[in-house]
Amino acid sequence: WDQADPFTAERRGERLFGRGTADDKAGVITHAHALRILASLADGELPCSVTVFIEGEEEVGSPSFENFLTTHRDRLASDVIVVADSSNWKVGTPSLTTSLRGVVQVDVRLDMLDHALHSGMYGGPVLDAATAMCRLIASCHDDAGDVAVAGLVSRSQADADFPDYPEADFRADAGILDGVELSGTGDLTARLWTKPSLTLIGMDVTPLELAGNVLTPSCTARLSLRIAPGQDPAAAQEALVAHLEKHVPFGGRLTVTGREAGPAFDGSEVTPASEAAHWALSTAWDTEAVNIGQGGSIPFIATLKETFPGAQVLVTGIEDPDTRAHSENESMHLGELERIVVAEALLLARLSGAIGS
C-alpha cells in the first residue's frame, strides 16, 4: 500500500484510497445518502417503502443469508431489489450490470507418499506431491489458455449490447506486463464475462525459508472456477471433479472437497425497473448508461431471486477500472460516488411515482 494504514481512508486527488472503500463500503454509503436526499425533500418521509439490508458475508459465500431471508421474508419482500456491489464501464460512463459469472470453489488434495523422503535418495522414480499437483492443475487449461474442463457452459461471443473492450485498454486497466500474451480465445468481453475461468487461489507448499531436499508427501490446492451464465453450479463442480480424477498424475490419491457453489446471474431482460435505472443513471451522469457484464460473482442474488421470484433485481455500483478491488491501493472516484447517490435517489423517486416517466 502507498499509505501507512489501509484501513484509514486517504484522499489523493479525486480518489479515496483504503481497504474496502469501493468494495463494498461505497455501496452502504450509496444507499444511506440516497435515502437521506429523498427524506430531506419530503419532511423526513420517503416516497416509497424501503428496506436496507447490509450483507457482510458475501466474500465468504453468504452462509447465513438464506436462513436470514427465510426468517425475515415478510419484512424483506420487495418489488425491486437494488444491489450496489458492481462497477461502471469507466469513470464518466454509468452502467447497469446485467450479467455475472457464478463461482465454484474446491480444495484439491493429492497424496503421493505416506511420509516425506530424501529427494536425493528417492527422487526420480517418485514425484513429490507439489510437482504432481502442478501437473494436475496445468491440465485444466489448453494450450490457448481456455479452460479445458469438459461439460462447462461457454459462450465465445458476449451479449450484443455490451460495449467493445479494446485490448489496449484492457491491458492498461489490468496492468499486464509488456510482452505477456492474453490467454483464451473469443471476444475479450466473453472471456471476462460469459466464458469460464479457473484460478489457483491458494496452495500448501513448503515456503522458501523452510525448503530442504525433501520429497513432499502431500499437497493441497484451492481452485476457484468462475462459471458462465446458464451453468448449474453443481454440474460445474461435478465436471471439474471428473476432470481432476481423469488427469491425476501417476496414480496419486486424489481428494476433492467442495467449499462454495454460487450460480451466475442473467439480468438481461428489459423491465420497467431496468428502464427506470437506465434513466436515473443517464440523468445523474448526463451520459447514456450502458449494460455491462462482470466476471465476478454475487451468489446471494440467486438466493434473492428464489425467495422473491417476482422481484426485479438491479445491480449497480461505484467501481471502475482503477478501483483495484481485493488488491493493495483500492480506491473509488469521489465524483462517481456523488453521481451514483443521485442516481439511486432518482431511481427510487421514479419507481415510487414521485417523478413521472
Predicted regions and their residues:
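Active-site metal-coordination/substrate-binding segment of hydrolases
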Residues: 1-51, 339
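Zn-dependent metallopeptidase/amidohydrolase metal-coordination segment
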Residues: 16, 109, 133, 203, ...
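A generic structural motif
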Residues: 22, 114, 225-232, 262
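Short beta-strand/turn micro-motifs at beta-sheet edges
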Residues: 41, 94-98, 208-213
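Histidine/acidic-residue-rich, glycine-tolerant segments that coordinate divalent metal ions
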Residues: 47-128
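Acidic-enriched catalytic cores of C-N bond-cleaving enzymes acting on peptides and small amides
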Residues: 89, 98, 119-203, 231-253
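Short, solvent-exposed beta-strand/turn "edge" segments of beta-rich domains on protein surfaces
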Residues: 125-126, 210-217
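A short beta-alpha structural unit
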Residues: 226-228, 255-270
